[in-house]
């Protein structure tokens, strides 16, 4: 190398590149034939949630307490933001007695 910086011509590889055998000849342990039976499914984790929504009739504030999984609470959220409306007891009675 001449100078302070190395050039491509100055770099000399000392080790030769050799292919490596990726087949290491390891043996896998015997697996059960029915893998599905041996796998134990974990029960999904339930979390308590407090949901505050407005009544679909009079718009009074309603509180709803639920235990739900992550997927379950998302499904409930989609329903409540979509076409499902909750009713308070007063509006329920009004509808039951022929009102609205």
Curated annotation (Swiss-Prot):
> Is this entry keyworded Secreted?
no
Per the record, the GO terms for biological process are: DNA-templated transcription; symbiont-mediated perturbation of host cell cycle G1/S transition checkpoint; symbiont-mediated suppression of host innate immune response; symbiont-mediated suppression of host type I interferon-mediated signaling pathway
Residue segments, region E7 terminal domain: 1-43
Q: In residue numbers, where are the unnamed zinc fingers?
A: 55-91
Question: What InterPro entries would the database entry show?
Answer: Papilloma_E7
Q: Which Gene3D superfamilies match?
A: 3.30.160.330
Carries keyword Repressor?
A: no
GO MF term list: DNA binding; DNA-binding transcription factor activity; protein domain specific binding; zinc ion binding
Q: Name one GO cellular component term.
A: host cell nucleus
User: Which branch of life, at top level?
Assistant: Viruses
Q: Which family does it belong to?
A: Belongs to the papillomaviridae E7 protein family.
Q: Write out the domain note.
A: The E7 terminal domain is an intrinsically disordered domain, whose flexibility and conformational transitions confer target adaptability to the oncoprotein. It allows adaptation to a variety of protein targets and exposes the PEST degradation sequence that regulates its turnover in the cell.
- State the name under which the record lists this protein: Protein E7
């Amino acid at each position: 190398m001449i100078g302070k910086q190395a050039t491509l011509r100055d770099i000399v590889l000392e080790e030769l590149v050799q292919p490596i055998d990726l087949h290491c000849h390891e043996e896998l342990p015997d697996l059960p034939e029915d893998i599905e039976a041996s796998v134990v499914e974990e029960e999904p984790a339930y979390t308590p949630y407090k949901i505050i929504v407005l009544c679909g009739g009079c718009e009074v504030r309603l509180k709803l307490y639920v235990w739900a999984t992550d997927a379950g609470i998302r499904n409930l959220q989609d329903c409540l933001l979509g076409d499902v409306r909750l009713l308070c007891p007063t509006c329920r009675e009004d509808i039951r007695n022929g009102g609205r």
